[in-house]
Amino acid sequence: NKTSADATVTNGNSCYSLAGATYNVYQGPNATGTPIATFTTDANGHAELPKPLANGVYSVKEIKAPKGYKLDEKVYTFSIDGRDANLDVQDDPGTLALQVIKKDSNSGQTPQGNASLAGAVYQVSYQQNGQTIVREGTTDELGRVLPAFTRIPFGVITVQEIKAPEGYKLDPSIHTYTISPNNPGVTDFYELEPEDLTEEVIRGGVAIEKRDAVTGKTPQGDASFAGIKFDIV
């Protein structure tokens, strides 16, 4: 009988299934040599050997984890002495460490002017154990939320900026990601694409009025203010 090692992560989440775990059975206690039998769990995590075993000591090892779970490397031993043997095992569910990194929409990780990538507050939401979990994190000067958001179940995750850093506009978008154990390249650590979380710097205009030093306003004689160029540095 197989169960989840952390049901709060897997309960009600279709990204996890107890079906499809495959085990090899070996003669002796060390799970070595040629397997004498193989069995696969059903949706309830239950499996039975296809035929009875003779009395003796046997070992079992998982060779394929079910969807959403980590492979269990442990070797389990049991003995047959004329009675049925029951074996209870658990698999650890896979989870994500979510790294949020923000960038300037034009310059990348270099803030413009007096703006700063530090101080942006992000809200991460996801479903776990029948509840909506909401967590918050604040960016550092490189635009990173540290530490990363850890122990997030596979599934739908939303990320939203709720406070912009100094000198930048608030990003009102709700960014939604669906991350499953079947996504190519998904490991325990998942970094959100920085291009999704860019900041637009707040810009202001400049008005210049040139005046005559003597009259205080209009030019003298045939002089003219027209065509004068200014450099803004």
Task: Label each residue range with its predicted role.
Residues 1-233:
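Solvent-exposed loop/turn and edge beta-strand elements of beta-rich ligand-binding domains
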